[in-house]
Amino acid sequence: MQKNLLWFVLSFLPALAFAQSPFDGTWKTNMTASKLSQKPYEFSLNNGTYSCGSCVPKMENVKADGHDQNVAAPGRDYDTLAVKIVDDHSARFTGKKAGKPVYEQTRSTSRDGSTLTIASMNYPADGSQAFKTEVKFTRVGKAPAGANATSGSWRIQNVSEDEAGLTSTWKRSGDNLSMSTPTGVSWEAKLDGKEYPVKGSSYDKYTVSVKSLGDRSIEATYRRDGKVATVEKITVSADGKQMTIVADNKLLGRISTFIDDKQ
């Protein structure tokens, strides 16, 4: 009887010892269920120049002549920007880093100027898979008289994105946690609150520090050049099917909640 009981107990030890953490696996962001910050974005394309009041750092009076203009600044992921006006309701943007495209973007409004669509192709710096995004906005502030219709104050409504830009893979082993994406962003960190490098794409100047908030919750703090950029509270549901990420972007002053589904 005792041997049978011992065998019964020992038979469960491998499963317990090697049980997956709630974070383990591949996750995909459900943009329909996510709640994005409603703080407005501000753009101006007027008198042959482009300005972005909501950008960090801010961008002012960039020539909109279709040629690469120097916009290098600490904290900016591209060093040149080319802005080309297509017509009264649309414009094209190309951001580059060291001559290589970071993104190519088209901005266009509805004929009545009430909605804005920004469609982008994004190119990771390490050559990882490029991916598309499309963001739709609703106007909350008028464009100045004579300005391109893409100007004004805009509130984000929804985002659609290629799977590569929405997917991440997580793995926890003891006090070690790793995250990677198809677009080349990855990190490995201990749950000790110390800073570890973020690799890939434009995140070469970023670090991440991670601490546990419980069996199903962690806090990840991203820093750029030593300054806190974003703090994320990440929690996996009790059934293990959903991961909620509350992202507090300290640089932009925006708080968004992302819902990821287990794949």
Regions found by a protein language model. Name each.
Residues M1-L5:
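Positively charged n-region of N-terminal signal peptides that target proteins for export
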